[in-house]
UniProtKB/Swiss-Prot annotation:
It is found in: Nucleus. GO terms for cellular component: nucleus. It comes from Coprinopsis cinerea (strain Okayama-7 / 130 / ATCC MYA-4618 / FGSC 9003) (Inky cap fungus). InterPro entries: SAM-dependent_MTases_sf. This is Secondary metabolism regulator laeA. One of its GO terms (biological process) is methylation. Keywords: Methyltransferase, Nucleus, S-adenosyl-L-methionine, Sporulation, Transcription, Transcription regulation, Transferase. Disruption phenotype: Leads to the production of coprinoferrin. Belongs to the methyltransferase superfamily. LaeA methyltransferase family.
Amino acid sequence: MSLKYYLNDLSDSDSESESECAEGSSPQDEQNGFYDYRSPPDSADTSIFEDTGRSSSERPMSPTEVCSTDFEEKVPFSSELVVIPESMLKKREEYGRFFSNFKKAIYHLPADEEEWDRQERLHQSFIEMFGRKYPPELSEILKSDEYYEKRCLDLGCGTGCWIKEVARDFPYCEAVGVDLVVVPDTRDFPPNLRCEMDDVNLGLQHFFGRFDVVHARLLSSGIKDYQLLIENIARTLRPGGLVELQEYDFHIYDCNRRRFELSTNELAPPWWPRWMTFFNEAIRKMQGDVDAATHLLKWVRTHPGFEQVRYEERWIPIIPGNLDPLEPMYARLQADVSVYLRSGRPLLLKSGLSEMEVDILENNAIREFYESETTQYTRLQCVCARRNNAVLDHLPPSYNFR
């Protein structure tokens, strides 16, 4: 079985089955560990068309495939149909959870049913938290009566929940999602939505100058250099385009909104901040940019390519303590943190903690959620900005990771 999908890198090559190149790729492709989605195999599998009795050019497109004959004029950077070998669709199993098979991936939360369900619920909570799906400017930017005149890019799209909303609400735009794994369920994808399988740490050069909106939410744990990501986004946006960035800072705050400053030298209360301290350190070991949220506003505000910079933050009382009864949305977020603890467990174990140590952190944090009388906050920091007309220098060759 092969899935029609965009592919920008190969899986980890630790085993023979995992290191197979797509059929038709050259030995040099295999050596470089990179399969360019703009250079498809000559012998692409078209068996999915056989039951229709129609050629691929006659058959309606599915959301996860694309042919240049259908899109070459509407989407200049689209390419031939690419077939991903079954080995690329496999996931790595670690500590009972499943993960992206991308080599050297920094992001280390699971890609399985439990985590996808959490992401879907979190998306709905974000809508309630902000009272809107999108920044106010987005509607005006994406409004068009011409197919694919406007384009929207979602980096780290996960289940595709945000980019699906965009594709439905703006049916004339082209919506593109990028993630380390294949989107789990594409059956309800609108026809103007497609996805790419890629690691954004490798750069966005193939997108430069082609999008009107770029959205990135909760990516920092999987990004090696977030400031460099902003450089890439600035070059991806067209003049007048919009960027929206939303990140947590991987710290917990007390009832006075002061940061807990704890160490990983002991297992002691407060437990939720202690768990987050260990998690913060584990992400650092994987080279994730855990400090990105703290610097988002400065990085965007001082960038020569952006203007009309706007900052918002939300203080989320994950542990309500003595606060008045929470809105249902915050209660759901609190419940979802228990799922988040389980999702973070493999990374804590990978960082060197024992099963017993992780159990102590996790069980006491959950107890603290429901028994503590002291309010504890998580801080969400958000930056929106418009792309101005400034012509930016090319990124140095050292930034071309591919």
